[in-house]
Amino acid sequence: MSALNKPGVDADAVLLKALLTTREQLGLTQAELAGILGVNRAALSRRGESGGLRPQSKTGELALLLIRAYRALFALFGGNLEDMRHFLRSENRHLAGVPLQQMNQVQGLVRVVEYLDAIRGK
């Protein structure tokens, strides 16, 4: 049984907690996270105060993609946070740019996730 299918589990709170953990692990600033999600920093803070982020919302879908990128990086680098952060902030010739900068646009975020999935062999 999925954790989200259990009674009493709030999917909005679970997504927000996973997103904030992802931000911390990847060493993203609040401004960088807000840029990826397409919201301003104040809106991001309000979501934290409200206790959740709807998975079905546009922001929620972008958050799920970012979490997917984190999980792919974790698998590729064996959980080495320094290497994961280096990947995001370094020029990548296959992606023709810096992944973190590309992730500020939806198509860039999708491209980075697809690239990570491809090199993992998924």
What are these regions (language model features)?
Residues 1-122:
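Non-transmembrane "mature" sequence context
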